Amino acid sequence: MNSFSPTEDTIAAIATAVSPGQGSIAAIRISGSSAIETSKNIVDVPGIQDWSTHKVLYGHVTEENRKKYIDEVLILVMKGPRSFTGEDVVEIHCHGGIIPVQKILERILAFPSVRRAEPGEFSQRAVLNGRLSLTQAESISELVSARSRKAAELAINGIEGNIQTTIQSIRKRLIEQLTEIEARIDFEEDLPLLDEKHVKNEIVAIKKDLNELIDNAKRGSWVRSGLKVALTGKPNVGKSSLMNRLSKQEKAIVTDLPGTTRDILESEIILEGIPVTFIDTAGLRDTKDIIEKIGISRTKKTLIHADLIILIFDYSSGWTNEDESILKQLPINIPLLIVGNKSDLTNDQSFEKVPKYILKKENLVIISAKTGNGEDDLINYLLKKCGSSQTHGLDIALNERQLDLAKSTMKSLENINKVFDEKLPWDFWTIDLRQAINYLGELTGEDLTESLLDNIFSKFCIGK
Ligand SMILES: Nc1nc2c(c(=O)[nH]1)N(C=O)[C@@H](CNc1ccc(C(=O)N[C@@H](CCC(=O)O)C(=O)O)cc1)CN2
Ligand SMILES: Nc1nc2c(ncn2[C@@H]2O[C@H](COP(=O)(O)OP(=O)(O)OP(=O)(O)O)[C@@H](O)[C@H]2O)c(=O)[nH]1
Ligand SMILES: [K+]
Ligand SMILES: [Mg+2]
């Protein structure tokens, strides 16, 4: 566990989402050594009530002069270490809406020993006090922001500790190899020979496990943040019409004037539990119109960040040089679907106006945004790309921070290939192995500086 010094201040924050007219109950959470004392000072509880742990008390929070009541409340006392943070925790459950909640919080913060909690600070304390592992705390935050059931399921797995145990076991295997090697460096003559090939094979096996986690992380990120699908193509091919149809909304303006769309527009649907955001963009062409030019430059920026690009062309008039030129300009590392639109206007000869190499592509779908013909094929393609078949069996998903560290670990382990091929002495193996072990330690939080930890938790929401 980490060995940071225990925190002194008592912290307080609103723990529930509050807005006027919404939520009949809200909770304020106080954690730290003066949590109970402070609470006793601001509430009147009738009769003799017991402030012992895991009990609920009934009472009223008073104004500062103790003459008037701010609200009628329930108070939940959890004495450390038997609490979420491991410190003394008091929750005050008051009426919802913003005014009572804020007045009570202000009343609490007026005590010099209490200050407002930073975002994520309750969870950070839970980690520092050994109540939660880092990846568990991160998973709690992911559960809070989950937008689909699958995302919630993955977050629960993380809360149960599956990321922590998986990474720890990989890290342990690396430590075993490092220990063997270091023993050879220190006491070569007393120990049986260590076979380089044997060590290399174990590292290959570890890399395979890590790689699986890295692949899963990509699918996990679709589940969590959804899939961004950018629609592009020449002006007037029907990008906006297609987005409107897929999202069953008349969100984008559609006219027969080329260059209608300028601002980037987004519309979300949920496909088999995965949020899919369609992004409608300005049609690509050379133009002197200043506004359209800005729109086109935004289109290009959007395309780089898409998970999938749909290139639309007008199937009824055929594949043109402009379509070809757009195709060539698309970022090559992003999956592409080509959609021939306006099939309702075509006759039997339309396919002759489209080159064979385009027609033969398996990522080609012919549709009509007007009649809806072919829409099912398009949806099926998207499902194949991101639907439940892709996320079936997915039970562990690293977040972005964890993924970066897993990738850095991979890089360090890959360096060892060179060390092996060049038959370098054992000292060289230890450099990259130690680096890999450190990365995984940063991932699990076992090897982490205080400032890195601050940085991770600052991204949590307030009161978490
Ligand atoms: N009202 C409320 N609901 C909540 C939370 C909270 O802080 N307050 N949680 C916050 O995220 C989650 C639950 N997490 C919690 C984790 C541990 C303890 C706790 O008191 N643990 C003690 C007692 C367990 C026992 O009696 O066996 C312990 O572990 O020792 C409480 C809540 C979700 N619901
Ligand atoms: N017949 C037919 N017309 C369509 C179809 N899809 C779009 N249109 C028409 O084509 C014209 C252009 O449609 P938009 O959706 O505005 O095309 P766009 O690609 O968004 O155009 P820009 O935003 O200007 O780049 C409109 O008149 C639409 O009604 C289709 O499948 N069949
Ligand atoms: K148009
Ligand atoms: Mg448009």
Curated annotation (Swiss-Prot):
UniProt: Mg(2+) binding residues: 240, 261
Gene Ontology BP terms: tRNA methylation; tRNA wobble uridine modification
Entry binding sites for (6S)-5-formyl-5,6,7,8-tetrahydrofolate: 29, 91, 131, 464
HAMAP family: GTPase_MnmE
Organism: Prochlorococcus marinus (strain NATL2A)
Molecular function terms from GO: GTP binding; GTPase activity; metal ion binding
Entry similarity comment: Belongs to the TRAFAC class TrmE-Era-EngA-EngB-Septin-like GTPase superfamily. TrmE GTPase family.
Stored SMART domains: RAB
Record flagged with keyword Glycosyltransferase: no
Gene coding for it: mnmE
Reported function: Exhibits a very high intrinsic GTPase hydrolysis rate. Involved in the addition of a carboxymethylaminomethyl (cmnm) group at the wobble position (U34) of certain tRNAs, forming tRNA-cmnm(5)s(2)U34.
Protein name, UniProt field: tRNA modification GTPase MnmE
Enzyme class: hydrolase
Pfam families cross-referenced by the UniProt entry: MMR_HSR1, MnmE_helical, TrmE_N
Subunit structure: Homodimer. Heterotetramer of two MnmE and two MnmG subunits.
Cofactor: K(+)
4Fe-4S is among the record's keywords: no
Enzyme Commission number: 3.6.-.-
Textual note on the cofactor: Binds 1 potassium ion per subunit.
